[in-house]
Amino acid sequence: MKIPYGESNFKKIITQDFFYIDKTEYISLLEQHGSYNILLRPRRFGKTLFLSTLRSYYDILCRNEFEALFGHLAIGHNPTPLKNSYQIIAFDFSGIETGSHENVRQGFSGRTGDSLRKFLVRYGYSQGDILRIEEEERNGPAAMLSRFFALIGEAHIYLVIDEYDNFANAVLGDSLELFTEIVGKGGFVRAFYEVIKTATMEGIVDRRFITCLLYTSDA
């Protein structure tokens, strides 16, 4: 059995015989106690791996793999009502360049566009749909996301974000002015999350799971 040092892909760990500490019992607790969860933990705590676990568990396209991936784990013995019932939209905002307003905007917009394209390809949307999203790229991440939600209509969405605060904390450490520009009123980051809030209120986003960093003295 192999040690999964630095490995955060749940499916790979399970199917390639890596050592795995079963934390899937927490999935049922999360499902019972709210639809909108935030996991605040230090670096190297396993946040990204747990997020990957949730994606495999809830993704409707993974339903035929459920027994192979989860059958021997706690959640496999007691699955929840919502298993494999969602389309998953996943964002990862770690490692965005924060040297300037344009750096952050390009990085954030690029990550947003990549995630939306991957979703549309995975769930069988047309090339025309992808082009409609790309047409909004020049208008910023909020415009892309707004078009995306309009496009997918009544799809049952589970939205996950890994390290949503990573770049914002880096910016805050360097420049309060830049932080205010991107996160404050009128900022493109704030606009992005306002679109998510609206989609949640409209029932397009049914559940959310977000990871963020708990900063310690050695972080």
Language model regions located:
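Conserved lysine of the Walker
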Residues: K47
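Post-Walker A helix-loop "phosphate-sensing" segment adjacent to the P-loop in P-loop NTPases
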Residues: Y57-E67
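Mid-core helix/loop region of P-loop NTP-binding domains shared across ATPases and GTPases
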Residues: F119-E163, G186
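Substrate-engagement module of ASCE P-loop NTPases
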Residues: F148, E181-I204
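Conserved small/polar residues in nucleotide/adenosyl-binding loops
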Residues: Y215-A219
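N-terminal pre-Walker A segment at the start of P-loop NTPase domains
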Residues: Y5-E25
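P-loop NTPase motor core
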Residues: F70-R117
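Structural recognition of the conserved hydrophobic beta-strand(s) that form the central parallel beta-sheet
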Residues: V160, R207-C212
